[in-house]
Amino acid sequence: MAAPGPRALRAALCGGCCCLLLCAQLVLAGKGARGFGRGALLRLNVWPTTQGGCKHLGHCEHCVDRAHNFSICVWQQCGPEEPGHCVAQAEVVKEGCSIYNHSESCPASHHHSTEEPKPSTTGSPPIPEDHSPGFDGASFIGGIVLVLSLQATAFFVLRFLKAKDSTYQTLI
């Protein structure tokens, strides 16, 4: 079998680049595998493990949000007077407790504290704001512009290299 020619190599390179860009767009758009959403490659979805587990997630929405964890945490509320707390799925006590694992099912917080919040002196990073899932038109247009500019750059680079190869002539 003969070695693949330069056109086959170029086609393979272009196909691989297109697949890579498509995967990047899907991940950034939140269409990837479970646990991968907007910015998941940067955040690496290790929020609970870097912050000391599920117990650091103080709100039901943050506890069960897939952007903050791999759904290993659930919100447990064992009575109307208790505000509830975030626990790992393996630590759930099922007797007389309500378990919430979706942000839509989280109980509405009717309890408002009368105390003023005290300034924190710990060096913990702020919790990132939640972004509503859905179609982001600006990101989509930006992705299209990015892909088209990369394809145009690759086209002109390959055209330049091909033109440079054709100027060589043999002496014989």
Swiss-Prot record:
* Transmembrane regions: 138-158
Where does it reside? Membrane
Keywords from the named record? Glycoprotein, Membrane, Signal, Transmembrane, Transmembrane helix
**Residue intervals annotated with topology Cytoplasmic:** 159-172
Signal sequence coordinates: 1-29
Q: Per the record, what ranges lie on the membrane's Extracellular side?
A: 30-137
Entry-listed glycosylation sites: 69, 101
- Kindly give the membrane topology term recorded for this protein: Single-pass type I membrane protein
Give the main localization category. membrane
Q: Region Disordered: which residues?
A: 108-132
Keyword check for Signal: yes
The record's comment on protein family reads: Belongs to the CD164 family.
Q: What is this protein called?
A: CD164 sialomucin-like 2 protein
Q: Which organism is it from?
A: Mus musculus (Mouse)
